[in-house]
Amino acid sequence: MKIRTRYAPSPTGFLHIGGARTALFNYLFAKHHNGDFILRIEDSDNSRNIKDGEKSQIENLLWLGIIPDEKPGSETKFGPYRQSEKLERYQKLAQELIKKGFAYYAFDNQEELKLQKKEQIAKGIFSFRYDQNWLKISDQEKQKRLKNKHFVIRFKVDKAKNFCWNDLVRGQICFEGSAISDWVIIKSDGFPTYNFAVVVDDFDMEISHIFRGEEHISNTPKQIGIYQAFNWKTPKFGHLTIITDKNGKKLSKRDKNLFQFIEDYKNQGYHSEAFFNFLALLGWTSPDSQEFFDHKSLIKAFDYKRLSKAPSHFDIEKLNWFSKSYISKMPVDKILENLELSDNQIWNRFFVETFQKSSIKYADFYKNFEFFHRPKQEMDEKMLEIFEKLDKKPVKIFASKIDYQNWDYTKINDLIKEIGQKLEITGKNLLLPIRLATTFTNSGPELARAIWLLGKKIIEKRLLKWK
């Protein structure tokens, strides 16, 4: 049997960190076993779908390096890959369940359902149990009500059964059928509910293994019931633990202190392979505690048995460390492909070489680029106050000896060393006066590099009064 996994988002939002990790683990598992990874779009809830939601999901998966073997638009025997294109299939199978006695029409209105819930709460039953009243009506009454077209189709849960599975992450899990209410499989608008459509889709696409978030544990017994009703083979399930923030709380889309969506990290210029690597370690560890993996080595190393049963912690500092490490090892040409800087390619290369080791993300290059592209017109008060207390001799010598005709980093660096030897000074005593006079700031990259990047016109203008 070929391993087939899937990631099945709804286009109701953009790709979230948790969703990306789910997609990644399904992808790694499939590729480790030479299987297929499928992207399916669960768009049956039109009221919640957002414009470009599907496009965002696909583009951000591709940015991470999670490449589906099949997706919307693929022409295979397993499609279509959007739920909205399969409505007839769901409705046909729902009718089949009715004929087999596994489902039935229910004609309750909202007020009647509220009354049922209220009566059960009064009896101390706080988890709603649908009372199956509509199973007792005559065929004549049923046909009469069907003409009004206000009904849903409910799955008839076998209350005598236990619904169990050996979870790939958590081990044996069981739910008593008596604790599960008869649930809606087809809504009044004719659209399937999630728990019904997802089973049909997974069966149609021959999905063998499903890794998903722990919030789906309570959905699993309902889905197993559908598999059993059709006598279909049930896939293997694995439920991943939650991802928490630095305070140990579950990641929330309402938390404004941490980017929640992959799009945000992409736009900030995080290294995509670094994020891929970092994401894999949110709930999975290698046998030898290795942390750095390229794409192929991660696929080779991935073993679902090493998925954690404990919550994983999203550590932004760890992500920054990964991204910085990846960027520091990149060929300069590759970095330049991701940046739009000046028209001077020699300057661009020197600029990237200057900031490569200190940059966490591509946005850091742009931040530093602004310093040179839009240089300050004068020293601010704070810097001026520092500068006034310093010995100006290094600045005067530098201003009188710098060679503007042969603008060269090595010559600038040698001149600074020469001044230090002449005045018998080092460190801040040598560098800080020159740095403030030339760059108008007391910090930055190696001084000679900063001076070269600012360019001879700006430096000559700033040092004019010190000649």
Swiss-Prot record:
It catalyses: tRNA(Glu) + L-glutamate + ATP = L-glutamyl-tRNA(Glu) + AMP + diphosphate. Transmembrane segments: none annotated. GO terms for cellular component: cytosol. One of its GO terms (biological process) is glutamyl-tRNA aminoacylation. A motif ('HIGH' region) lies at residues 9-19. It is an enzyme of class 6 (ligase). The keyword NADP does not apply. PANTHER family: GLUTAMATE--TRNA LIGASE, GLUTAMATE--TRNA LIGASE, MITOCHONDRIAL-RELATED. This is Glutamate--tRNA ligase. It comes from Mesomycoplasma hyopneumoniae (strain J / ATCC 25934 / NCTC 10110) (Mycoplasma hyopneumoniae). The lineage of its organism: Bacteria, Bacillati, Mycoplasmatota, Mycoplasmoidales, Metamycoplasmataceae. The gene is gltX.
